[in-house]
Amino acid sequence: MSLKYDPDDSLFNASWATVLLSERDVAGQIPINFVTTSAISLRAACFGDNKFGRIAAEKCLSNLLAVGYRRFNIDLYWSPELSRWILCPVSIPEGLDVVKTSAEATPTATAEIAEGTVIAQPDESSGELLYDLGPYKCSNSLDLQDLLNVFLDYFKYTDTDLVIYTKFLSLNLHAAADPTSIDEPASNVPSEQLPVESNRVSSILEGYLGSYIYGPSNLLKDRRNLNDSWYVVDDGYKPIIEYFTIEENFEGIQSTPDGWPSMKYIQLAAERRLLVEYGSVDPQLGNYDLSVENEVIFPPGYLTSTIPVAAADDGSLDSGCLYDPDTTDISRINASWAMSNHIPIPRNLSNESFRYISDLVVNLTACGMTSTLNETLFGHTADVTPDPYRNLTLSSSWAWALGQPAAPVSDLDSAESDEKRCAIMDLSLDGHWRTANCSETRRAACRVDNQPFRWALSSEPLSYEDAYNDACPPTTEFSVPRTGLENTYLSRHLLSQSPDLIDPTSSEPLKHEIWIDFNSLDTETCWVAGGSHATCPYTSDPDKLQRRTVLVTAVAGIVICIIAALTLFVKCNANRRNSRRNKRVIQGWEYEGVPS
């Protein structure tokens, strides 16, 4: 029976839907190589106890997808005996006798099993039969196809604009160990025992997820002629060109040697959901030719740039941060596909230990890096204890302060009210965002020459609407940070201003609150850039307002608080009469923000 996307029901909570959707959308035109996310090792999160069962793997991967992990490092083992890519590090032999014992089998009884047999016991939690292979307990059927079935079901389950997120796979290829010599390195796999065409990783991926994959061939074709690729789509899907190099030939055709498409281009224009690269490849598989798979899978390390990082005891970074106070030139800031090399995990689960990890992930994201979890959290895998994993991935949220965006507190007609419908950067909250009344007067954040990291502060305080039209001087425009690193550059620029203008410790809001171009005036909880007349993209097309169940369950699955003390709440009143309030709401649901 094929595995499915089947996360724990307890993970579903819609309170963070606005946060995740708004961050996805504000970064929607940034080339994907500059957008940070959260990465995780499947080996650590799902098999840290050395148990490789199908039932547990289905639940674990489903939970990780549900709580918002978008990049997965996966270890695959080629078993010549089985002619399959398996998840267990040891090949399960087909020619040996299988001795089934109960879970209560004594060590003496086990020791009496004759050599040349394999012991199998039912797993205590799932009842699935697992084979004892040295330090490992493995299902005889957990393989690459099983994982891809979970991804396939997930993609089908989240197929509306509101809940689409691009995923990334980094595949590490190994040779499975011989079950008769588990403690020894795997032998070299001769050419005749390597995968045939139908068993190559690219062939399997193409067969299961081909319609979702954006591969090297797609990138090469798009880069060669931007006039016929990234430039011919909706303006809102085009990548921000200041992030990459553009060349033009004598015919006026533009190309790029280093550009990447934006998330909106991949998801909405190209209708793709997945990018795959090879990570490491064991020398025992040295004859496995990766070059023939370049249609589907990127070469080793193509989607990864590992940044060495040193962290202090409080979770701040001693070294490795990509913010450079001496330059705003993006060509000198190597943030493309930037990944942290390690997240140190304390042994014991406590409020203090989790706060340290959370603070570290927050700082890595602010410094322009994707955080990578390569260890099992506090000794518990995500199929059994998913809470720490969901808390950690939400720590990579970079924009809103805790409890934000706050919902309007008034029962008046919020369709005509500007209460809590515009965003400010609050320097008293470490540069995170919160909501404010749009009629309040503040200075505005002005982007210089459309450059990602160059900012100016407007001279006069104005309302949000007036700020969009009149605040910013020539060669600048009212704007909003679109990534964690852009946000850091803006907040650091503001902090460099005279204390007469900016003072995070001041009780005067004018000195620590700055307008950014982000509002939900058109549709409550639908946050958009473009001034007070910008419209919500999810209410203009009836086709985008289908499948409310998907919105409530799939989006909600990537939701929880960053710290244990935060209480989550979502208010749904689908039957509210609209005689007094003509409020427009995404998908008919009233997302009231994240309570503080």
For the regions a language model picked out, list residue spans one by one.
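Extracellular, disulfide-bonded carbohydrate-recognition/adhesion ectodomains
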Residues: 202-596
